[in-house]
């Protein structure tokens, strides 16, 4: 069973409406849409789809991330998705993305394997800033950028293995993101890396964490696929810039076809 999983927050609700409408129009092969958002603001969606909404309180702590503790908390929620659904698999997407054509969840399977997309670090451009945080988390030199696409397909089995590994090595996902990874943000680093010149004060990213875990420790369920073969019809935007009129026009026209 496959669910679609979205971690959002009130500032992204306007984007989420379009994301949900695009799923309704274009996506098949899943059971439920599972949404986790911050407590305090009710999320109301006008949709006939099967949607389950969970509310979580933000931790009452400060964090060195420039946008506050919500960024790290969202990563923790995404990597602990098994708390919110009993699905065997989930597709994670961000609320500011939007499908633009038909796709079935079977796309993410190839034979008896699941697809996880990557690119070489040499191909990552500005994404190279994630190399040192990835090396720090995985406790070895990473070889690939595992976050080049805007959709990510998780399995319960491998996620639970990942969670166990993080518990054993870092004391849990939230403990890693909120305690150990703080040094990545503050640049007060207590470890060595051959790529330290690429580090610009960015913390670990959840999909680099999971993708490198797959590559180094438990690749059994997955086939690593180069991003050049990525064919998901999706539009990725950046909600921090706000939803501009031209973007609204594009989305409305697409959904009306």
Question: Which positions does each model-derived feature cover?
Answer:
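Nucleotide-sugar donor-binding/catalytic module of glycosyltransferases
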Residues: 4, 16, 74, 97-107, ...
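Active-site-proximal specificity loops/subdomain of glycosyltransferases
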Residues: 44-84
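GT-A fold catalytic core of metal-dependent nucleotide-sugar glycosyltransferases
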Residues: 77-121
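Short, solvent-exposed loop/turn segments at secondary-structure junctions
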Residues: 9-12, 39-42, 58-61, 95-100, ...
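Conserved catalytic core of nucleotide-sugar-dependent glycosyltransferases
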Residues: 103-197
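Conserved glycosyltransferase catalytic-site signature
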Residues: 68-76, 96-97, 203-208
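N-terminal anchoring/stem segment of glycosyltransferases
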Residues: 1-61, 238-242
């Amino acid at each position: 069973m496959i669910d679609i999983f979205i971690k959002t927050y009130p500032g992204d609700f306007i984007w989420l409406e379009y994301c949900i409408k695009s799923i309704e129009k274009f996506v098949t092969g899943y059971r439920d849409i599972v949404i986790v958002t911050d407590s305090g603001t009710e999320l109301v969606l006008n949709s006939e789809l099967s949607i389950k909404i969970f509310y979580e309180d933000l931790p009452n702590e400060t964090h060195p991330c420039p946008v506050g503790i919500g960024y790290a908390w969202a990563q923790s929620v995404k990597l602990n998705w098994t708390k919110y659904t009993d699905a065997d698999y989930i597709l994670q997407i961000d609320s500011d993305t939007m499908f633009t054509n038909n796709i079935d969840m079977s796309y993410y399977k190839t034979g008896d394997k699941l697809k996880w997309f990557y690119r070489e670090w040499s191909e990552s451009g500005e994404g190279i800033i994630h190399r040192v945080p990835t090396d720090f988390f995985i406790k070895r030199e990473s070889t690939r950028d595992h976050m080049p696409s805007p959709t990510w397909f998780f399995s319960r089995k491998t996620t639970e293995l990942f969670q166990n590994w993080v518990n054993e090595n870092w004391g849990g996902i939230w403990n890693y993101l909120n305690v150990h990874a703080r040094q990545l943000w503050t640049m007060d680093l207590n470890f060595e890396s051959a790529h330290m010149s690429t580090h610009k004060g960015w913390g670990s990213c959840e999909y680099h964490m999971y993708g490198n875990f797959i590559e180094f420790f438990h690749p059994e369920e997955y086939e690593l696929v180069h991003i050049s073969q990525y064919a998901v019809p999706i539009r990725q935007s950046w909600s921090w810039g706000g939803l501009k009129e031209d973007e609204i026009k594009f989305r409305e026209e697409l959904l009306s076809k």
